Curated annotation (Swiss-Prot):
This is Peptide chain release factor 1. Peptide chain release factor 1 directs the termination of translation in response to the peptide chain termination codons UAG and UAA. PROSITE patterns: RF_PROK_I. The modification N5-methylglutamine is found at residue 235. The keyword Cytoplasm applies. Belongs to the prokaryotic/mitochondrial release factor family. Signal peptide: none annotated. GO terms for cellular component: cytoplasm.
Amino acid sequence: MKPSMIKKLATLSERLDELNRLLSSEDVTNDIDNYRKITREHAEITPIVEQFRAYEQAEIDIKEAQAMLADPEMKEFAQEETEAGKQKLDDIEKQLQKLLLPKDPNDERNIFLEIRAGTGGDESALFAGDLFRMYSRYAERQGWKVEIVSANESEVGGYKEIIAKIEGFGAYSKLKFESGGHRVQRVPETETQGRIHTSACTVAVLPEVDEVSDVTINPADIRIDTFRASGAGGQHINKTDSAVRITHFPTGIVVECQDGRSQHSNKAQAMQVLAARIKAKQVDEQQSKIASERRSLIGSGDRSERIRTYNYPQGRITDHRINLTLYKIDAITEGDMDELINALAAEHQADLLATLGEDN
């Protein structure tokens, strides 16, 4: 193990001892906010320190086994113990590398999922509907709640644009790699010649902010318009102006919300989406400034980038970022996304490990 890594782990070990002392202090237990902060830190570093102490014990065991090598009667046993100990060290070191990876502070958050039809006209809108169904089914499998915030339905079905809130622990960690361009290749139902058409949609996954107040939005920088909500082709027309459109002048971001039961609820939802988009824009700008040349393609979340192709005639889905092709398009589009999501997460983790190795 690299000296820099050992030094970092030793510091964490000392910190855990300090936290244990603090947690037994009445001054800490009587201060609820401080107590929660300390218990959270304690929970975060305990598994790391436990692995490090197991690593140190394995080193001791290897030294004791090597000391027995000089004894002819114990030599074979000592060799076996030494090899087993070295394998254990390797396994623990790999586990420690993963535990030390920087955690995304947004991983546990709820998300706003935005899907917009792109090139391809009606077929693109239908594909947007298929994507929303896929994510909704996946969310159901996870036990998450899906709530449509705003939907602009197409007259042939599907959506020109749909925004949904997905509530569930770890929603962002699972779906954050879905941001980008999604392309579909299939024969439309209206195609009489059997020709394959290509259409596209863009997906954006935004972590929900804790409070709208966490993002600075100057009231003078926004315009709020109200209008009558309607479904596809003017269906379900409300008699009151309950739909809300918010325009944020500094960023040019426009948010519409019309699926709530009242103007008040629509405005609250629209402000939440606006805050999430502004926050995401700020994070994108910060990352752009500090991005290194080997910035992870998976983690970039560039919405203009084509990330995946859904080829229906061949029954395949290809994720271009990791060159993964799966011939199970029906299962995946019905929400069986685990293999795809886990592969993306594993690649991202490998990329972070490579970065950690360079930093060390």
